[in-house]
A protein has these predicted regions:
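Conserved donor NDP-sugar-binding/catalytic core segment of glycosyltransferases
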Residues: 91, 95-127
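Short, acidic, metal-binding catalytic loop of nucleotide-sugar glycosyltransferases
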Residues: 22-34
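Cell-envelope/extracellular polymer assembly enzymes that use nucleotide-activated donors
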Residues: 4-7, 34, 176
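Short beta-strand-to-loop acidic/aromatic patch adjacent to the donor-nucleotide binding site
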Residues: 79-91
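Glycine-rich, basic loop-to-helix element that forms the pyrophosphate-binding segment
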Residues: 60-78
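Short alpha-helix within the catalytic core of nucleotide-sugar-dependent glycosyltransferases
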Residues: 21-25, 70, 93-106, 132, ...
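Conserved nucleotide-sugar donor-binding catalytic segment
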Residues: 9, 135-215
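A conserved acidic beta->alpha catalytic loop
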Residues: 38-47, 87
Length: 261
């Protein structure tokens, strides 16, 4: 087995055992990675998980999701060069870690690799695919965020240089990080499905959709040059409206999937 230099953090409250086992198993199938779970103290994960599914369990600091992920990432040893996190109900694609790490191994100027992401419903049925593309890394500064966080990989050195995750954001902290990362190197798009994002009512992203849209708008606007910010409302409100509509459509179609099972 090749040297393990990839670290994946899985934050969880320990309330979705079946999904969590599927998530951890998918990471094992995605490539050679050190898997660290961060969960509230006292959550009896050992009763539902076998030791081969993860490498380390860390206590959640209790300061929010972004703080928990950031804490766990900073706990990785110097041997870990590439990092990311994955929701406890999402999945990595087969061999996706090998696929995502290759461009960064070949070019030290590449600080992040992202690809396509499938949206699946509660039962794992495919709803649609976020195909993304090279354009997404430019679009996210003034339009919808189409850079898929699930399945991506980030160079840890660049993550730390960028200051890690902003603990002030509850939902859109990935967008804030991606924009900051561009100051330290290149973002590379690979045209392959790297992960599956589970769209269901219990998902934080789905349940907190309005707050996520609001945070993303704030992040995009603050990243603009000062002389452009005052004009941001011209395109921000139509964009926010469109994002909400897309979210409602995904919720609708995921509901249709459930009702026909």
């Amino acid at each position: 087995m090749s040297k393990c230099d990839i670290g994946i953090v899985v934050p969880t409250l320990g309330t979705r055992d079946v999904y969590l086992r599927q998530t951890l198993s998918s990471i094992r199938r995605a490539g050679n990675a050190q898997i660290v779970i961060v969960a509230p103290t006292g959550v009896p994960l050992h009763k539902s998980l076998t030791s081969d599914l993860y490498d380390r369990l860390l206590p959640d600091p209790g300061k929010g999701l972004s703080a928990a992920i950031d804490f766990a990432i900073r706990e990785f040893s110097d041997e870990i060069k590439f990092i990311n996190w994955l929701g406890d109900d999402d999945l990595l694609a087969l061999n996706s870690l090998d696929c995502a790490s290759k461009p960064m191994r070949e070019n030290e100027e590449t600080v992040m690799v992202y690809g396509k992401c499938e949206y699946i419903d509660r039962s794992g049925n495919k709803i649609t695919t976020n195909r993304s593309g090279n354009y997404a890394r430019f679009l996210m500064r003034f339009g919808p965020q189409l850079v898929s966080q699930p399945g991506s990989l980030i160079r840890k050195e660049a993550y730390l240089a960028a200051g890690g995750l902003n603990h002030g954001y509850k939902c859109a902290f990935d967008l804030d990080l991606f924009i900051k990362l561009q100051k330290f190197g290149k973002m590379h798009y690979t045209p392959a499905v790297l992960a599956s994002f589970r769209w269901h009512a219990d998902s934080l992203t789905v349940a907190s959709r309005s707050e996520s849209v609001k945070e993303a708008r704030e992040i995009r606007t603050s990243a603009l040059p000062f002389y452009i910010r005052k004009f941001a409302a011209i395109w921000e409100f139509p964009i926010s409206f469109a994002i909400r509509i897309v979210g409602k459509l995904l919720t609708f179609y995921s509901g249709v999937r459930r009702s026909t099972e």
